[in-house]
């Protein structure tokens, strides 16, 4: 039997391929960044052709670096930036337009109109999502309304829609020469178009956005012994690999963190923050600004659901300090600079660059640094940036407790910012609970590998995955209750200052 599982992680800023053994240990990887296209304020795009070329390259190079071939891989999993949307021609494979990224806010008027006329309540009930620029439905409506010839091609069945998992899979399995047009339940649950109960595209929701059903991919389980597709032997893998796992990136991180029981939660720190709480087979409809989403579905088992708090700007706020303000030269310097001060000096930074996501959902908000005096330095701004990451997570944790009745005792964390010890200590202090990082921090790719490997029996079940999970580091709270309350009160005041800044009606 082959000894390894590979995962493609198609992310917001880069695409990587990682290869894992049965212990869940990484044996090889390759990663390439892709361009962030910013044509105007609030617009964020990716070049789909570049993404596919990067995907093929990282897969081929990871195999080459590890001196493995496709015969050494039992399966391939795909995980991806969710909501990012594109449309391409089924006959030529050419995209009609750049991919519109999840951070993009060009659809704010579409989202606002949904709430004004009552359609938003139907979307919340059926799809578990509030109308927002974040999700795919509005992006696809915008493409159909603004790209010449697209609607006519869509109605003829010539145009295909997908999130980036679907685009990557279609190309891996042959593209216009027979590629499969498939997504999984987790990605479909982020479109505002899928019914959470039926796990199928909902005709009423499609009608809200005037979307032809024939554009949409088939929805399948996240992990399936019947492959979603098989890589073509003339493609970048240079051989056939069954693709048996697909998960949106945050759901993949839940699986990688082995949060498989109701009440378990993880927080992924990347471009944005994404905090998910497993709610088991129960659909918990949020009354506190969270998303209800599919966590995963393995084979023909019932789906497992989650509550999610999606935060648009966390790691990218640190990038902003580097790229726009120039006060740090790299992400690691944010920690050393912030350590020069004992506290934030009264400064709060709310990085609402594209509005506020969970639990506020205010597209009229914009970023603000408040509380400045002549006493403050760039170190206070760096500290406030790290605190902003943690306070936004506190907003979500409190909303989860209100919705579910679950009060966390420990928070599992992963993603790039977890290498920042100061940020993780602040997170423990702000929440008042232990924060724990696993040995394998790349849990998104690992979760996709787990989904693929479970489908073919490489791992027998959840107990195998739990045995693989190991704690690397733990941070415990050091703040008093009074410190915690005072800090959070200042944060809530700062958040209010960012709202009603731009007109979205």
Swiss-Prot record:
> Which pathway does it take part in?
Polyol metabolism; glycerol degradation via glycerol kinase pathway; sn-glycerol 3-phosphate from glycerol: step 1/1
Q: State the species of origin.
A: Mycolicibacterium vanbaalenii (strain DSM 7251 / JCM 13017 / BCRC 16820 / KCTC 9966 / NRRL B-24157 / PYR-1)
Which family does the record assign? Answer: Belongs to the FGGY kinase family.
The residues that cross the membrane are none
Which keywords describe this protein according to UniProt?
Answer: ATP-binding, Glycerol metabolism, Kinase, Nucleotide-binding, Transferase
Organism superkingdom: Bacteria
Q: Could you tell me one molecular function GO term of this UniProt entry?
A: glycerol kinase activity
Per the entry, what this protein does is: Key enzyme in the regulation of glycerol uptake and metabolism. Catalyzes the phosphorylation of glycerol to yield sn-glycerol 3-phosphate.
User: In the Enzyme Commission scheme, what number(s) does this protein have?
Assistant: 2.7.1.30
Q: Which InterPro entries does this one have?
A: ATPase_NBD, Carb_kinase_FGGY, Carb_kinase_FGGY_CS, FGGY_C, FGGY_N, Glycerol_kin
User: What residues does sn-glycerol 3-phosphate bind to?
Assistant: 12, 82-83, 134, 249
Q: By its UniProt entry, which PANTHER family does this protein fall under?
A: GLYCEROL KINASE (PTHR10196:SF69), SUGAR KINASE (PTHR10196)
Q: Where does glycerol bind?
A: 82-83, 134, 249-250
- Binding annotation for ADP: 12, 16, 271, 315, 416, 420
PROSITE patterns for this protein: FGGY_KINASES_1, FGGY_KINASES_2
Recorded GO cellular component terms are:
cytosol
Q: Which Pfam families has this protein been placed in?
A: FGGY_C, FGGY_N
Quickly give the catalysed reaction: glycerol + ATP = sn-glycerol 3-phosphate + ADP + H(+)
- What this protein is called in its record is Glycerol kinase
Q: What are the binding positions for ATP in this chain? A: 12-14, 271, 315, 319, 416
How is activity regulated here?
A: Inhibited by fructose 1,6-bisphosphate (FBP).
**What is this enzyme's class at the first EC digit?**
transferase
Instruction: Give yes or no: UniProt keyword Calcium.
Output: no
